[in-house]
């Protein structure tokens, strides 16, 4: 399940892509299969990075014209030279970082001029509901330390000499799932409603029936769990 729409980045062959906060590699693999690129996935969590490494062979096209590599790093201190990457993806990361301004500075620094940047964070309203339903959700180690408003995040990037391109929201059907998890936080693993809704989401991702695709499209503006914003560095 990808949050960033890879198509909207207009990936060109012979480019470098950084997925900052790559997790288990979902966006890395999507970019890798899209064009002849050098894709770099970096995350603070070594366990997630190892899972990405372990998962890559099923996507490996064994081509001399593309590559995909992984490593660990701190988003506030990236080990790359200025203007290294043509494209930068940062999906569901900034809400975890206390020193978020330093992380955004680094994102801009390592992106080339005219390079594309795609950032996603939890949308304000669905996230606010989660925080309201469960204090434990807020206090999860390594969890979310802030709730972004769309205009706040957009301004944060634009003032660093970047041009806004477009935005959209994703995963509306996932918002009720997280609300249920927060409502039954201490017993979520045993909750009938949580488990059944999870089964529904898995079924939906596998089958993609028209009715749920249509329903999610209609609900995105209201409860889309993630807000995705695309920029170009001036």
What do the PLM-derived regions correspond to, one by one?
Residues 162-172:
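Conserved S-adenosyl-L-methionine
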Residues 3-129, 229-232:
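Conserved SAM-binding loop
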Residues 75, 143, 148, 226:
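A conserved catalytic-core signature of glycosyltransferases
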Residues 132, 171-234:
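A C-terminal cap/extension of S-adenosyl-L-methionine-dependent methyltransferases
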Residues 122-146, 155-156:
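Short, glycine-/aromatic-enriched active-site segment of Class I SAM-dependent methyltransferases
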Residues 57-59, 135-138, 182-186:
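Short, hinge-like loop/turn segments at secondary-structure boundaries
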């Amino acid at each position: 399940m990808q949050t960033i729409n890879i198509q909207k980045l207009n990936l060109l062959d012979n480019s470098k892509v950084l997925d900052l906060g790559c997790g288990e590699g979902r966006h890395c693999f999507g970019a890798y299969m899209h064009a002849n690129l050098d894709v770099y996935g970096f995350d603070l969590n070594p366990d997630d990075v190892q899972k990405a490494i372990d998962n890559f062979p099923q996507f490996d096209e064994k081509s001399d014209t593309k590559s995909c590599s992984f490593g660990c790093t701190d988003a506030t201190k990236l080990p790359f030279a200025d203007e290294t990457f043509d494209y930068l993806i940062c999906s569901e990361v900034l809400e975890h970082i206390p020193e978020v301004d330093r992380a955004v500075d680094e994102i801009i620094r390592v992106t080339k001029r005219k390079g594309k940047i795609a950032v996603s964070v939890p949308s304000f309203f669905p996230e606010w509901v989660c925080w309201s339903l469960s204090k434990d959700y807020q206090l999860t180690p390594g969890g979310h330390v802030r709730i972004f408003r769309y205009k706040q995040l957009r301004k944060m990037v634009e003032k660093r000499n970047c041009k806004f391109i477009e935005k959209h929201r994703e995963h509306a059907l996932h918002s009720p799932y997280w609300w249920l998890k927060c409502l039954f936080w201490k017993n979520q693993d045993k909750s009938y409603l949580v488990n059944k809704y999870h089964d529904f989401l898995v079924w939906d991702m596998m089958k993609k029936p028209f009715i749920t695709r249509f329903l999610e499209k209609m609900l995105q503006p209201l409860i889309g769990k993630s807000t995705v914003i695309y920029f170009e560095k001036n």
